[in-house]
Amino acid sequence: YSVKPGQTFKKPAGSLTVTQIINATITKLGKADLPKALNISEKMPKDIVDNTPTKYNPETEALDYWESLEGMRVEVTKPKVTGPQYKGDIYVLPGDYKGQKLNNIGGVNLRPGVQNTEVLPITVGNKFVAKAKDYFNENITGVVTYKNKTYKIDPIDPNALKGLLQDGGLKREVSKIYPSEDKLTIASYNIENFSANNKGHDETPEEKVDKIANSFIKEVHSPDIITLIEVQDNNGGVNDGTVDGVKSGEKLAQRIKSLGGPDYKYTEIAPVDGKDGGKPGANIRVAYLYNPKRVTLIGKEKGGSEEAARFVNGHLEKNPARIDPKSVHFEKVRKSLAAEFEFKGERIVVIANHLKSKLGDD
């Protein structure tokens, strides 16, 4: 788009303004210690976001409170982490805050009509690893800013945060369902943008492959059938028209076997390039791992990318098959995948889903 003299451009709606100083001239008048950072624990308004949009009430309304602190140094007392890092931020609760109780896994429960405005985002970067129940053993000082439609705190010394973080002891849950000769076990597992590509920016690191494979064996006890969510094509986010993801699925299956798990088989139907949403070029899809010593995938012919599943005489005509892939309800989203298996002489149809889960999903 060419810009012409006299044209006016406005900032897109939906974000608040941030105070800026433009073309400033700085004059040094002397030296002084920085003022003490404001400890925010006691004065944070609880639950109310903005009940009176036309009035400024920082004492009672969270939006106005954070606006009053924009650009200021603040201190958070020994923050408690309420969940893992997400898009470079972790969400914390001040360690001395009395107005909110954490649940048994260190998170904050959603309640009707309550916004949990006392949970604070702190900028830590995309490589920072933390989990619920972890905590910092010292106070964190930072500057309040506004980014991506939310107020957050930028730490004064972000490099020091890793050394202050303490393990809260939260362990990944282990399934209480164990294999049984006469019972079929099925699991659904989001493997989070998994591909056979282990090089470059769009890689799936080998450590991640090991972690997921071990999870299948030790935490969910090697289910007979696994519906996989977010299997990428063979080269991940490389946007070159590749849609086949068999190498991605088989890499995971082979790693499970090498670590002592079952010799799973993999099946999928590749999507049409760029039609199922997710990361551009990665073509995520749902797929299946199944243990051929326990179940049989019925039939030999599978459906096509744009071919709808048909149930004929009590069975899938093609197997596996995508459910109504041309429907307007499945535009730019993962198509559900049906698969028919036989277990102990009985047939069962399993449907793998990965539906939209957030407003920003494409």
Predicted regions located by residue number:
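Beta-strand-turn-beta hairpins that frame and shape the catalytic cleft
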Residues: 176-186, 292-296, 332-359
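Extended non-catalytic accessory segments flanking core domains
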Residues: 1-199, 203-222, 316-329, 333-335
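Residue-level preference for long, well-ordered alpha-helices that form the structural scaffold
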Residues: 201-208, 241, 245, 362
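Solvent-exposed loop/turn segments at secondary-structure junctions
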Residues: 3-8, 81, 191-196, 231-235, ...
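Active-site surface patch of divalent metal-dependent phosphodiester/phosphate bond hydrolases
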Residues: 213-322, 326-327
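A short local loop/turn or secondary-structure capping micro-motif enriched for an aromatic residue
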Residues: 161-163, 306-308, 357-360
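Beta-sheet entry/capping signal
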Residues: 150-152, 183-186, 224-225, 263-265, ...
